Amino acid sequence: MRVRVIDLDGSITAQDRVLRTFRPDVYDLRRWGPRVRLACRWKRFYRLERRLDRDFGPTDHHDSWISLLGSGDFHHMTLALLRRLRHPFNLLVIDKHPDWLRGLPMLHCGAWLQHAAKLPQVRRIFHLGGDRHFDDARRWLAPRRLIEANKIVVLPAVRRFDHGFWQDLPHQPLRRNLHTPIDRDRLEELLCPYLDELDRLPLYVSLDKDAMWMPESLTNWDSGHLDLNEVQEIMQFFLKAAGNDLIGMDIVGDWSHVRTQGLFRRFLRRLEHPRHKVDADQARICNERTNLMLLRFLKHDPVAESITFPSRLKSA
């Protein structure tokens, strides 16, 4: 897989070791960053989408990319990458937040997933590692029908969700308990009903590093529970189940100074971002180290050949 940087905030282009090691294609979209950060009107999103289409050229299933997008404030740009794909695929999302809020009049970084679920090429969505804003008051904005129909399969990080409609839905956390790391046996147990389907279609992965705990990611949001080994365990399992057919991937969750354009985005920033002080150099070093390990894992050893799955995982 090739690596590209969609540079909206300068967070990735500041990571010299990533640039030197992987020599990604860099697309300078810094001018767009303040105008789409956190949210944007659909008209603006379509203009940016056309710009990406011109820059990237035609989509080729045999030429898949790992796209680095910078801050999680730009996670809604994943939708533009998904809309470029023409063949059916399953979507794996690893994220602390649901990102599926309904009813918003604009495209928001916390709402893109419910739009992705409507794309005809997206067959099933697996949302893993979530913890925050699932069963609080925002549950009323969740795409309940899609979740109940298993169009979106939800596997929280460490706990069951216990308010509202979640009480009636079967869902189990990735960890058996708070202190037991995720392993292949646990993933097999949780995902066994979907293994044949995963085997039939290619996979797209969208990773927000806010699902990871603080020592391994410093984001513009709050941090999650998973460590890097667990994230790699999850990706390795899904890749193996999909026959290593990875149609594309994007990574968000780097930290950057927040620069927004317009009163509404400034309001969103104050309303939604946690107010904690972050040392910019520390954030860059931390996220660069994690990005390097993720990219090495994906490019050099995406699936450990020594791992053998039960025979039913290999059935067509």
Positions of predicted regions on the chain:
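Long, hydrophobic, well-ordered secondary-structure blocks that form the structural core
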Residues: 91-104, 108-115
